[in-house]
Swiss-Prot record:
<keyword id="KW-0496">Mitochondrion</keyword>
<keyword id="KW-1133">Transmembrane helix</keyword>
<keyword id="KW-0813">Transport</keyword>
<feature type="transmembrane region" description="Helical">
    <location>
        <begin position="56"/>
        <end position="76"/>
    </location>
</feature>
<dbReference type="InterPro" id="IPR038430">
    <property type="entry name" value="NDAH_ubi_oxred_su3_sf"/>
</dbReference>
<keyword id="KW-0679">Respiratory chain</keyword>
<keyword id="KW-0520">NAD</keyword>
<feature type="transmembrane region" description="Helical">
    <location>
        <begin position="3"/>
        <end position="23"/>
    </location>
</feature>
<keyword id="KW-0249">Electron transport</keyword>
<feature type="transmembrane region" description="Helical">
    <location>
        <begin position="85"/>
        <end position="105"/>
    </location>
</feature>
<dbReference type="GO" id="GO:0008137">
    <property type="term" value="F:NADH dehydrogenase (ubiquinone) activity"/>
</dbReference>
<dbReference type="GO" id="GO:0031966">
    <property type="term" value="C:mitochondrial membrane"/>
</dbReference>
<dbReference type="GO" id="GO:0030964">
    <property type="term" value="C:NADH dehydrogenase complex"/>
</dbReference>
<dbReference type="InterPro" id="IPR000440">
    <property type="entry name" value="NADH_UbQ/plastoQ_OxRdtase_su3"/>
</dbReference>
<protein>
    <recommendedName>
        <fullName>NADH-ubiquinone oxidoreductase chain 3</fullName>
        <ecNumber>7.1.1.2</ecNumber>
    </recommendedName>
</protein>
<keyword id="KW-0830">Ubiquinone</keyword>
<comment type="function">
    <text>Core subunit of the mitochondrial membrane respiratory chain NADH dehydrogenase (Complex I) that is believed to belong to the minimal assembly required for catalysis. Complex I functions in the transfer of electrons from NADH to the respiratory chain. The immediate electron acceptor for the enzyme is believed to be ubiquinone.</text>
</comment>
Length: 117
């Protein structure tokens, strides 16, 4: 109990000291460039309706699909503890086959080709 009170006292004092020091430190006034928004590769003061390549959008959607696939397949090692592990294997195989067929379809349609033909 004594150790708990000591740790609580030290953390409270340390937090108060850091809060007081942060108010005493001089504040820097930012200039115009630091106040303007920054987006990598885009002029923040230009038009908000810049043309956007649909290929970036397609790659982002594919990334989200495969990221979701990983999230669904991560608990599979614990699936062998279920009453019927073959059922879990069947659903995991169906998911992988469906995503593989979708990737092949996207590849054949040219959605993964970056260069214009």
């Amino acid at each position: 109990m004594n150790l708990l009170l000591t740790i609580l006292f030290i953390t409270t004092i340390l937090s108060l000291i850091l809060a007081i020091v942060s108010f005493w430190l001089p504040l820097m006034t930012p200039d115009y460039q630091k106040l303007s928004p920054y987006e990598c590769g885009f002029d923040p003061l230009g038009s908000a309706r810049l043309p956007f390549s649909i290929r970036f959008f397609l790659v982002a959607i594919l990334f989200l699909l495969f990221d979701l696939e990983i999230a669904l397949l991560l608990p599979l090692p614990w699936g062998d503890q279920l009453p019927s592990p073959m059922f879990t294997l069947l659903w995991a195989s169906a998911l992988l086959i469906m995503l593989t067929l979708g990737l092949i379809y996207e590849w054949l349609q040219g959605g993964l080709e970056w260069a214009e033909k």
